[in-house]
Curated annotation (Swiss-Prot):
ATP binds at P94, I95, C96, A97, G98, L99, G100, G101, G102, S103, S104. Its EC number is 2.7.1.148. Belongs to the GHMP kinase family. IspE subfamily. This is Putative 4-diphosphocytidyl-2-C-methyl-D-erythritol kinase. SUPFAM superfamilies: GHMP Kinase, C-terminal domain, Ribosomal protein S5 domain 2-like. Pfam families: GHMP_kinases_C (PF08544), GHMP_kinases_N (PF00288). One of its GO terms (molecular function) is ATP binding. It catalyses: 4-CDP-2-C-methyl-D-erythritol + ATP = 4-CDP-2-C-methyl-D-erythritol 2-phosphate + ADP + H(+). The keyword Kinase applies. Keywords: ATP-binding, Kinase, Nucleotide-binding, Transferase. The active site is at K10, D136.
Amino acid sequence: MEIIEKAPAKINLGLDIAGKYQDGFHELSMIMASVDLNDYLTITEIAEDKIVVESNNCKLPLNRKNDVYKAAHLLKRRYHISTGLKISLQKKIPICAGLGGGSSDAAATLRALNCLWKLNLSPKELIDVGFEIGSDVPYCIEAGCALISGKGEIVEPLATTLSTWVVLVKPDFGISTKTIFKEIDMATISRVDIPALKEALLANYYEDALQFMGNSLEDITIAKKPFIQKIKGRMIKCGADIALMTGSGPTVFALCRTEKRADRVVNSMKGFCKEVYKVRML
């Protein structure tokens, strides 16, 4: 039997670092939204009791370091599955970009195997398993627009009908999330009003939502990679409603209410960075 599963990218409409736990992890308060830039996983059962991961992206590890492998191995071991798997991962989401590609791939693997192996796990159970793999995986189980809190394990879907054009620009360098989080100083970090952003999104007030969007990690990442600020400035100059870094970077997204304005931003950025995508917020 073969299953094909889609894994959408995400952007952070709001990312606030609310505090730090005694175990060293940070308390997160974020609003994420899915966009229609997708990876695709094709999962096939094989007779041999092993997990084989292959991908069109040669930069990805295909062993236990890969989140897809981790997800498959975790479910296989926990539910005593004796058959093997071949997982083909068609990557379209840039890696090390702040777009949640690896987490979304892991979540897609969990969803697909839940179906393939007839495990009948609820979304809450999948979220709990996903959190063992990474802090963004719980959100990616159901994706959409959601408020994420705690260490990433608390996911509250938000019923907003706001949708807009999104331009993604990924510069030709990556960022280590661990490196950025090590630089956080709770005394000086910029804060984002997530409750106000949530309220604006639920009311479907686009202009109000724009005012409350932000990313607490931007200043830290831009201090290391000033080119990100140049991307933001160019997007705004071309008519974007807002330009923000997503996650710990380095990808910057612009929101544009009209496709004409989004096209203007795309055309300007194509001569500036190689990886430019025009997508919709789902």
